[in-house]
A protein has these predicted regions:
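N-terminal alpha-helical transmembrane segments of multi-pass membrane transport
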Residues: 1-80, 84, 95-101, 112, ...
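Transmembrane helix-loop junctions in multi-pass membrane proteins
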Residues: 3-4, 34-39, 85-90, 166-177, ...
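Transmembrane alpha-helical segments of multi-pass small-molecule transport proteins
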Residues: 21-26, 152-161, 182-207, 223-225, ...
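Membrane-interface loop-to-helix entry segments
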Residues: 23-30, 34-47, 174-180, 187-248, ...
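Helix-loop-helix module between adjacent transmembrane segments
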Residues: 31-32, 108-133, 139-174, 178-203, ...
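Flexible loop linkers connecting adjacent transmembrane helices
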Residues: 37-68, 92-102, 106, 114-147, ...
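Alpha-helical membrane segments and immediately flanking helix-loop junctions
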Residues: 58-96, 122-140, 144, 158-161, ...
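Extracellular/periplasmic helix-exit of transmembrane alpha-helices
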Residues: 117-127, 230-246, 254, 258-261, ...
Length: 490
């Protein structure tokens, strides 16, 4: 068993070294170049038309019987991103790579804002209607419909189904079980069974119930956690400037061994920052597009904007605030505090009454919503590979069993499995994103000309088959040419 653990750890270190740095940063930078930095140039517009509409009655908050609203889609996706990656993941990055890892997490987040925008936009443009008249989409659909690469789509789905067992089930149940154990002292085996029962109750209702659940829980848990974080940062206000400076300098000249910190090389700092960066926002994995493809939206770009905001909220906002609390506490170099407890210990130091409880409760809620949301992604991967209800039921059972196993597992080994699985999803997904960048540019130009500031809406029932496929089949489209929307009603 130890040999297997060592092999997984070595493979994780290799994949999230130079290979993923190249794929994630260069691939994302290429998309920024191809889209002429559309996300950054239009960030104000994106913010006002996404989060700015959450509390208003608008197309962002409405859905029909067969779909979910954009807000429910982003809540489901955020439920899959705001979890162990934002709390335990950030602590792990700092513990292993030093404070400088957060700088590389920022770089990954800025690049990934466009990456996630791109994959969600393409997922909506290539989505289909299933036998229940519900939208289905994701990387497997733009790999097949957009590029006619069904073999690569199947490969992504296989990698995805395996990865989700680690990222969704093992990691999140591990984080949730440890949080409950910290609060109550209840045996981990009992906690695992309780997690399993609660999860079954939610996932049996499908994407509609998952979306409704996430829409209620995500805002609540975000306010709870961020509220406590802001209070602590006010307490540490005189240290914030030096903490931010430390993050930047440590990114290029990592801290040598000090206290309980073993020291880190530049590559270690980059590796842990990027790995935790992608785990905190999912960009490039191809998972979130599966939820967004089910949204009630009139245009792919309009839904893609929610993806950019997801990355900003989960990585730039939540991860940074968590990191500042940890660094200001000074506990990151304490050998007696492991990564699993680092964030809770930092909160407890600043808020002796209730600090650790807030982190444990927040992590419990974060992890459970992630656990539920990622089952949906896994089911979508299996559904693409086979229509067999028996196989889907078996996968559901395995996912549930893994949630019990994860509640008993060691943290480092669980993270290593997840890192390897995530890498196997990234590669085929980026092949699709790069090769379909021309179609992505067309979709942006179509949105800019016909919908962005015109007040017009597209058709909420447009799919790849009845509208967007006409774009993807024009192999010799000139980038400067903008097509008028096709009218299929006349």
């Amino acid at each position: 068993m130890q040999t297997f653990i060592n092999v997984v750890g070595s493979l994780s270190d290799f994949l999230w070294g130079v290979p993923m740095i190249i794929v994630m940063l260069l691939g994302g930078s290429f998309l920024i170049y191809r889209t002429r930095a559309w996300v950054f140039k239009n960030f104000g517009y994106i913010w006002s038309n996404t989060f700015g509409k959450i509390f208003k009655k608008s197309e962002a908050t409405t859905a029909d019987e067969k779909s979910i609203s954009p807000v429910q889609a982003v809540s489901t996706a955020l439920a899959g991103t705001i979890g162990a990656g934002n709390i335990v993941g950030v602590a792990t990055a700092i513990k292993l790579g030093g404070p400088g890892a957060i700088f590389w997490l920022w770089i990954a987040a800025l690049v990934n804002m466009t990456t996630k925008f791109a994959e969600i936009t393409l997922a909506v443009a290539t989505r289909e209607k299933n036998e229940k008249d519900e939208f289905s989409g994701g990387p497997m659909y733009y790999l097949e419909n957009g590029l006619n690469m069904r073999w690569l789509a199947i490969m992504f789905s296989v990698f995805g189904a395996i990865a989700i067992l680690g990222t969704g089930s093992l990691v999140q149940s591990n984080a949730m079980a440890n949080s409950i154990n910290t609060i109550t002292g209840i045996d981990l085996r009992i906690i695992g069974v309780v997690i399993m029962i609660l999860m079954v109750i939610i996932i049996i209702g499908g994407i509609k119930r998952i979306g409704a659940f996430a829409e209620k829980i995500v805002p609540l848990m975000s306010v709870l956690y961020l509220g406590a974080t802001i209070v602590i940062l006010v307490i540490y206000r005189r240290q914030l400037g030096s903490a931010l400076g430390f993050i930047v300098t440590d990114a290029f000249k990592p801290t040598a061994a000090v206290g309980g910190f073993a020291g880190a090389t530049v590559l270690m700092t980059i590796r842990h920052g990027l790995a935790r960066g992608i785990f905190s926002n999912e960009a490039g994995l191809g998972s979130a597009p599966m939820a967004h493809a089910a949204a009630h939206t009139d245009h792919p770009v309009r839904q893609g904007m929610w993806g950019a905001i997801e990355v900003f909220v989960s990585s730039i906002l939540i991860c940074t605030m968590t990191a500042l609390v940890i660094i200001c506490s000074g506990l990151w170099s304490d050998a007696n505090v492991d990564a699993n407890r680092l964030t809770a210990a930092a909160f407890e130091k600043a808020l002796p009454v209730g600090g650790e409880m807030i982190v444990s409760l927040g992590l419990m809620l974060f992890a459970f919503t992630t656990l539920v949301s990622w089952y949906y992604y896994g089911d979508k991967c299996i559904s693409y590979i086979t229509k067999s209800k028996t196989i889907r039921s078996i996968y559901k059972a395995v996912y549930i069993i893994f949630s019990v196993v994860g509640s008993l597992g060691g943290l480092k080994f669980v993270w290593s499995i997840s890192d390897v699985a995530n890498a196997l999803m990234v590669i085929p997904n980026f092949i699709g994103l790069i090769l379909l960048s021309k179609q992505l540019v067309w979709l942006i130009k179509d949105f800019n000309k016909n919908y962005k500031d015109t007040g017009k809406l597209g058709n909420y029932n447009w799919t790849f088959d009845n509208h967007w496929g006409a774009v993807f089949n024009k192999r010799k489209v000139k980038e400067t040419q903008v097509f008028e929307p096709y009218d299929y009603d006349n």
